[in-house]
Amino acid sequence: MDRLQIIVVTYGRPDLVARCLSSVLRSIPEKTTVHVVDNNSPDDTAEMVAARFPEVTLHRRTSNDGFAVANNAVLTEVTAEYALLLNPDTEIEPGLLDHLLDGMDENPDVGMVGCRLVTADGILDHAAKRRIPSPWAALRYFALRLVGRTGSSYT
């Protein structure tokens, strides 16, 4: 049984998909399967994946039903201990996947983890930060929206 199954959903942008898959395959832990779900890209994305990354399982969809539908199509077949959903513009740093898996193994009460997102120049992407859900956080968010300060709810 796989320890990790990685799912990357694509719609075009073969350049980004190639960089994503290259970074994943450089860092891939043992017992990992990589799936690419192509959402009926209008370009040669699926063909590029098939030609350049034969070790990846390619799923070709006949329509673009969105990110969630494409992920769910593969998630129903996942038999691994863990699943990782990646956007195609993601690049994985060496050692990150092993670090995430070790963290999950050491914390069996945790059901999901996320990573810090940084821009191409290494700056933390504050727009991707989310707070822990709570009544206070929700109240603060909506109060800030009333005064037009939604950006500060992510800092």
How should each PLM-predicted stretch be described?
Residues 23, 38-47, 63, 93:
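A conserved acidic beta->alpha catalytic loop
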Residues 31-40, 59-61:
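Short beta-strand/loop segment that forms part of the nucleotide-sugar
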Residues 60-78:
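Glycine-rich, basic loop-to-helix element that forms the pyrophosphate-binding segment
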Residues 93-127:
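Conserved donor NDP-sugar-binding/catalytic core segment of glycosyltransferases
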Residues 132-155:
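Short, flexible, basic/aromatic active-site loop/helix in glycosyltransferases
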